[in-house]
Amino acid sequence: MNQPLLSVNNLTHLYAPGKGFSDVSFDLWPGEVLGIVGESGSGKTTLLKSISARLTPQQGEIHYENRSLYAMSEADRRRLLRTEWGVVHQHPLDGLRRQVSAGGNIGERLMATGARHYGDIRATAQKWLEEVEIPANRIDDLPTTFSGGMQQRLQIARNLVTHPKLVFMDEPTGGLDVSVQARLLDLLRGLVVELNLAVVIVTHDLGVARLLADRLLVMKQGQVVESGLTDRVLDDPHHPYTQLLVSSVLQN
């Protein structure tokens, strides 16, 4: 493919002075993982909501597969979120149906893309539970009975079961114990490669960014202050703020 999967041009959304983001531009290519890093309040999550069709920007354009995202109907944008895109929330229960079984959470996504045969849907759900290291015998259990790490893995299975082209992740390892984080990152890295996913991941954790991202955007107070290949940005940061971020991690 000789054109970006997602193209963001001069995007702005400011909901208060210094809150939000302004004049952000980047391209995302098929199979590429883009990390967005920066401290809390830098505009990362607001940007993620705008580029994933969940918050209309005030200025700028977003093109997905050469189609203007916000020129589409709201119904078409919702369809993208159900089928070709996935969204992994920091708090997994925000992305799961609490009163629907684990298998049902995965099955709903399959049905959104046209699956109708109950036996096939259940078999695929069981396969994906195993893929994300959840025992298949938990298929009929509610997500609320799972640990935080299992809930996050279930949310990932729900999003990836339809082999989406593009996945948006907001602090997917936030709030998890270090050992649980390590297993989840291992799992994510393997699935990203296996499914050739394009991913935009927001994280404040530079270790997560180094492990998963091909390229980085560094944000400070709503502005992208540095961008480039992950290893270059983290090993040879140019902007004083990026240098500060990297040095603070090294000191810790």
From Swiss-Prot:
Keywords (alphabetical) are: ATP-binding, Nucleotide-binding, Transport
State if ATP-binding is listed as a keyword. yes
Biological process GO terms, please?
A: organic phosphonate catabolic process; organic phosphonate metabolic process; organic phosphonate transport; peptide transport
Q: Which residues form the ABC transporter domain?
A: 6-246
User: Entry's SMART domains?
Assistant: AAA (SM00382)
What is a single cellular component term in the Gene Ontology annotation?
Answer: alpha-D-ribose 1-methylphosphonate 5-triphosphate synthase complex
Subunit note: Forms a complex with PhnG, PhnH, PhnI and PhnJ with the suggested composition PhnG(4)H(2)I(2)J(2)K.
- The protein in question is named Putative phosphonates utilization ATP-binding protein PhnK
Q: From which organism does this entry originate?
A: Escherichia coli (strain K12)
